[in-house]
């Protein structure tokens, strides 16, 4: 049985991935519920809600069974989602480029369709694209990080310097946004690089997703 509604996500060896999407995309036999759906059916959680608050280094949390309001700075802004999509998907835009977002804590970077990522990069002064077969990465002067705006339901979320950078290459910072061909639904995958600045609430009971700046 569940003995706590919150667990720390610490630096440790990865031993697998627990899918937290909707049952419509589960890869294993239908007689087995995805882990959070199983917790719901067993009434092991107070509410059909979980919340990710990711932080660089230590301090990340996964709150099960409700919302921990101490993790957010402002009002949580909710958007409706369609469980038939399987993934947690919402409409949005990046630097004014309209698209769809898949919110995925199992992805390290921010990955978007090649054409849209190139369009976004063209709007970021000092950012240089680098092609590699079916993927696209970019670099920038580490002392001049770009300002990248993600907009969801009319609210903007900016990447800070740490979120925008994913290591270095030849003395330049590597942008945490990567382009890739053939992405499903031509959607962006907003992974940890985005979620490190935003606390995200996943509400399976009301089929909605909430966003707020993390405290």
What are these regions (language model features)?
Residues 5, 54-56, 145-215:
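Aspartic protease catalytic domain
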Residues 19-24, 53-56, 63-68, 80, ...:
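Short, structured patches in soluble enzyme cores that scaffold and shape functional sites
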Residues 24-25, 57-58, 69-71, 107-110, ...:
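Solvent-exposed loop/turn segments at secondary-structure junctions
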């Amino acid at each position: 049985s569940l003995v706590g509604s919150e667990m720390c996500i610490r630096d440790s060896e990865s031993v697998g991935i627990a899918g937290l999407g909707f049952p419509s995309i589960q890869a294993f036999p239908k007689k087995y519920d995805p882990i959070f759906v199983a917790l719901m059916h067993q009434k092991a959680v107070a509410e059909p809600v979980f919340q990710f608050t990711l932080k660089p280094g230590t301090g990340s949390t996964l709150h099960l069974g409700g919302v921990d309001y101490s993790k957010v700075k402002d009002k949580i802004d909710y958007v409706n989602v369609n469980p038939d999509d399987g993934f947690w998907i919402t409409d949005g835009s990046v630097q004014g480029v309209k698209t769809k977002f898949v919110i995925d804590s199992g992805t390290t970077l921010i990955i978007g369709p090649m054409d849209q990522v190139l369009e976004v990069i063209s709007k970021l002064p000092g950012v240089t694209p680098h092609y590699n077969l079916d993927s696209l990465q970019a670099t920038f002067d580490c002392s001049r990080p770009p300002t990248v705006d993600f907009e969801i339901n009319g609210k903007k979320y900016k990447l800070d310097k740490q979120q925008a950078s994913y290591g270095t290459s030849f003395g330049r910072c590597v942008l945490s946004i990567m382009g890739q061909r053939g992405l499903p639904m031509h959607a962006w995958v907003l992974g940890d690089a985005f979620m490190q600045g935003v606390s995200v609430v996943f509400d399976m009971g009301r089929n909605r997703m909430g966003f707020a700046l993390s405290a």
